[in-house]
């Protein structure tokens, strides 16, 4: 039996639930297809009723328990209208239980779930494990009937429960649906109520079928989303493992349970605003039956930095202490613009404002921001941060809490992370295994002729990401084999519709041919395959030419009566996935978003420079772009470098699903470390590498970067540049 006790603080004080739970473990403990929830699932009942324990069993159905810790002499009277407990009149608790059971059945037996009352039995009990029935002075006829019918049990409750009999065994799909409903996961469904028959006839139906499939949170995701503890939590996982979903569910759950608590949800990518708001709203309504009030000041969803129009955590801090917020433009010559801006507030008197703080995309935020978060968090620092080791231009390493939040005057970490609160999400549900495998091999440069640009140095970290070391030891210069088990990438959308490979690439002689191919393919998908425009995203890997390339595609689509948008160039930066419009963008703007169909434009950009720093950046951008695909991925390249991608592609998949390579030598790892240092800030590099003068001015102010850059071959050359620049 799986034990899902998420609110451990409450359970530790709930002696009556503990007693009944110990009995349940004896009766159901050895059953594999059985789950016991504590105070779950919750519904917005008229009386705010919460069950003590709910057992979900594939053969026994659903068993609901409400336990009370009343003892002999506590209850004087139990009647149909009210009870007298400890000298006070309270409502008949059977009404509460029946109200809850009614809401549960309404949720279970909605037509979309395809569950019927005849499929499973539902039993519910009120239990007084510390009370003998003969100590109650008065019982009216209604309550006596309930006792005789075993709805109300007392200290001898085990006698009745031992007689519980199993019912009809649920089918596998019914059991999966039952768990999904109880876990609230089907609140994510974007189904329009359209029934799709298999086999599907076009790509749109395949997308709809995939979205209508049950999204069942796995144990790691469910534990991360539902657990409530005092103190901090960390959530780790690859792209597509559900980190944003988990944080959104946690935010909705906290707001539903503690409406007066101050909750902050912050993130790095501006285009995530709509997605996070949508997810939190879906889960909140699922939990409470009410629409989320987006203007509620107790739940704030804000960008980390903020801007002229959008509020941000940093900008709001500044306003509260009458300090002018610094913009990226103000800090553009700093190595870490946002970190430097945050550092100017660290010594200021900031108010401990929030009871709970949730941080998405933690890998992209500077340490100084976390120190500010610590200052605005109330004790015991209920801070949850989600981290993706591979979606950062910096080092593939997760900083520990003492690095993020600092130490106290005694040298101890201000915030400690308990092992049970370090959640690892291994399974990637967004990306097909081939898509994810290609993204990682390209992103790390596993088979790049220029050499590996990024590496994970611990087997434990590889395992945490859902890989396994098949052969070798992670030591300098060793031959190693690392595999991605298929079970950790279960998404297989191509099985619904195999007209297109889930992963495609096309090479062209000229850029115009490449752009025409993408434009025409989109036209075909929309007009012949009935794909919705908002289900398509085009990502250009070359930021220099992105605006002109994307506008070209936009013009072609417009002529064919297909709407599109270009966030940041033509439209607002967070305008993603608007109904009836294809999204045309860059990797940096696409970060954090996803789409059923992704076009990755200009993959030859990986091979246009021999500079190792740019190589690392370009490969990371390719990783981000490819992993946006939660369905089909179309990759294109043009020009004389295009064939280099094809060569690397074939080498990657000749070993699939295993990566066979030589682990970097000590010298190579040192070089990778230098590259990581020099690519540790995405924003400054985005500007600097496109402007040599800006870049040289930037590195002239950073001795560590100069040290990393000035190898024997380039030292003289770069020094001369700097001398001319400073004249």
Where are these regions (language model features)?
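Hydrophobic "anchor" residues on beta-strands that sit immediately upstream
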Residues: 35, 62, 356-359, 384
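Intrinsically disordered, low-complexity Ser/Thr/Pro/Gly-rich regulatory segments
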Residues: 1-51, 55-204, 208
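N-terminal pre-P-loop "Q-motif" helix
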Residues: 184-231, 238, 246
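Inter-Walker segment of RecA-like/P-loop motor cores
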Residues: 283-327, 331-336, 584-585
């Amino acid at each position: 039996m799986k034990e899902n006790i998420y609110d451990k603080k409450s359970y530790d004080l709930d002696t009556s639930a503990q007693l009944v739970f110990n009995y349940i473990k004896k009766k159901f403990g050895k059953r594999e297809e059985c789950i016991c929830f504590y105070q779950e699932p919750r519904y917005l009942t008229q009386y705010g009723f919460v069950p003590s324990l709910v057992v979900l069993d594939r053969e026994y159905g659903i068993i609901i328990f409400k336990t009370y810790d009343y003892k002999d002499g506590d209850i004087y009277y139990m009647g149909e209208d009210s009870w007298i407990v400890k000298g006070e009149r309270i409502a008949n608790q059977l009404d509460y239980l029946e109200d809850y059971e009614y809401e549960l059945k309404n949720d279970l037996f909605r037509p979309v779930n395809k569950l019927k009352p005849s499929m499973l039995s539902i039993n519910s009990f009120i239990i007084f494990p510390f009370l003998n029935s003969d100590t109650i002075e008065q019982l009216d006829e209604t309550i006596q009937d309930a006792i005789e019918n075993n709805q109300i049990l007392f200290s001898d409750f085990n006698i009745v429960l031992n007689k519980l009999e199993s019912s009809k065994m649920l089918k596998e799909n019914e059991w999966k649906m039952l768990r999904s409903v109880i876990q609230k996961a089907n609140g994510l469904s974007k189904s329009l109520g359209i029934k799709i028959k298999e086999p599907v006839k076009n790509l749109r139906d395949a997308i709809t079928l995939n979205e209508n499939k049950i999204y069942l949170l796995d144990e790691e995701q469910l534990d991360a989303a539902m657990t409530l503890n005092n103190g901090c939590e960390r959530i780790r996982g690859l792209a597509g493992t559900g980190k944003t979903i988990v944080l959104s569910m946690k935010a909705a759950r906290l707001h539903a349970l503690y409406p007066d608590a101050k909750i902050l949800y912050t993130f790095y990518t501006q285009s995530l605003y709509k997605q996070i708001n949508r997810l939190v709203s879906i889960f909140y309504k699922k939990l409470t039956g009410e629409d989320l009030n987006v203007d509620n000041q107790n739940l704030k969803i804000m960008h980390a930095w903020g801007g002229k129009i959008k509020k941000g955590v940093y900008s709001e801090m500044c306003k509260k202490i009458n300090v002018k917020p610094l913009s990226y433009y103000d800090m553009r010559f700093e190595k870490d613009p946002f970190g430097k801006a945050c550092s100017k507030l660290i010594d200021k008197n900031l108010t401990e404002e929030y009871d709970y703080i949730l941080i998405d995309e933690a890998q992209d935020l500077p340490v100084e921001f976390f120190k500010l978060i610590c200052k605005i968090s109330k004790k015991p620092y209920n801070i949850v941060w989600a981290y993706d080791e591979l979606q950062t231009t910096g080092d593939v390493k997760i900083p520990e809490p003492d690095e993020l939040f600092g130490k106290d005057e005694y040298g101890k970490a201000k915030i400690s992370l308990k092992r049970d609160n370090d959640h690892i999400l291994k399974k990637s549900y967004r990306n097909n295994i081939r898509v994810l495998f290609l993204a990682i091999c390209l992103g790390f440069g596993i088979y790049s002729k220029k050499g590996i640009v990024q590496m994970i140095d611990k087997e434990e970290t590889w395992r945490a990401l859902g890989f396994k070391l098949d052969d070798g030891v992670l030591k300098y210069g060793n031959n190693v084999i690392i595999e991605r088990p298929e079970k950790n990438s279960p998404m297989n959308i191509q099985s619904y519709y195999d007209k297109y490979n889930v992963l495609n690439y096309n090479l062209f002689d000229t850029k115009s041919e490449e752009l025409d191919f993408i434009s025409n393919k989109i036209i075909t998908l929309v007009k012949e395959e009935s794909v919705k425009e908002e289900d398509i995203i085009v990502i250009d890997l070359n930021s220099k030419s992105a605006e002109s390339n994307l506008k070209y595609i936009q013009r072609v689509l417009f002529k064919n009566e297909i709407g599109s948008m270009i966030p940041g160039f033509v439209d607002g930066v967070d305008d993603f996935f608007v109904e009836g419009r294809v999204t045309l963008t860059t990797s940096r703007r696409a970060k954090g978003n996803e789409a059923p169909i992704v076009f990755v434009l200009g993959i030859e950009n990986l091979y246009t420079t021999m500079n190792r720093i740019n190589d690392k950046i370009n490969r990371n951008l390719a990783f981000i772009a490819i992993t946006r695909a939660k369905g089909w991925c179309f990759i294109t390249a043009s020009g004389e470098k295009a064939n280099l991608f094809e060569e690397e592609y074939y080498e990657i998949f000749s070993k699939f699903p295993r990566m066979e390579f030589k682990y970097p030598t000590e010298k190579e790892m040192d070089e990778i470390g230098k590259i990581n240092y020099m690519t540790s800030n995405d924003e400054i590099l985005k500007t600097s590498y496109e402007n040599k003068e800006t870049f040289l001015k930037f590195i002239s102010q950073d001795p560590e970067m100069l040290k990393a850059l000035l190898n024997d071959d380039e030292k003289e050359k770069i020094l001369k540049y700097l001398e001319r620049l400073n004249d």
